[in-house]
From Swiss-Prot:
It catalyses: apo-[citrate lyase ACP] + 2'-(5''-triphospho-alpha-D-ribosyl)-3'-dephospho-CoA = holo-[citrate lyase ACP] + diphosphate. InterPro entries: CitX. The lineage of its organism: Bacteria, Pseudomonadati, Pseudomonadota, Gammaproteobacteria, Enterobacterales. HAMAP family: CitX. This is Apo-citrate lyase phosphoribosyl-dephospho-CoA transferase. Its EC number is 2.7.7.61.
Amino acid sequence: MHLLPELASHHAVSIPELLVSRDERQARQHAWLKHHPVPLVSFTVVAPGPIKDSEVTRRIFNHRVTALRALATKQGWQIQEQAALVSASGPEGMLSIAAPARDLKLATIELEHSHPLGRLWDIDVLTPEGEILSRRDYSLPPRRCLLCEQSAAVCARGKTHQLTDLLNRMEALLNDVDACNVN
């Protein structure tokens, strides 16, 4: 289920392409749930800027696949089906996991908080009925920025940081994880 970093497209995606890609992901999620009636873990990489498919985003994606598989194994949850693909919005993955959706969401939130690359992961958990469980459902604060302690959404809207600073931070986090052999 891992993606080969050397095959990254480096395509600079436009806003309309990104919006279409998000709609397509939502349609894939609902089609997936019709064929796999257990909770769905759907995940992407948080990648600032127009290039969503790069060696860095694919390597981050691959770390997340490994971490999610390890989480399922640790919890004794069965992965019933899995898929990886690349869309205009970058690497995407889907795992059907036989586990209570609420437990899955809480475990993935903990993974996002505890893993060094967690801030770069966007992990959605959908119930078999298609309801997306949100961080807000658990009274959790929004994601924090990569560079400061503000809300990531506030910094993104205000363009608080230079894109190069964000991309350099992403790569530094990834290199640290690789150097320490963290999965």
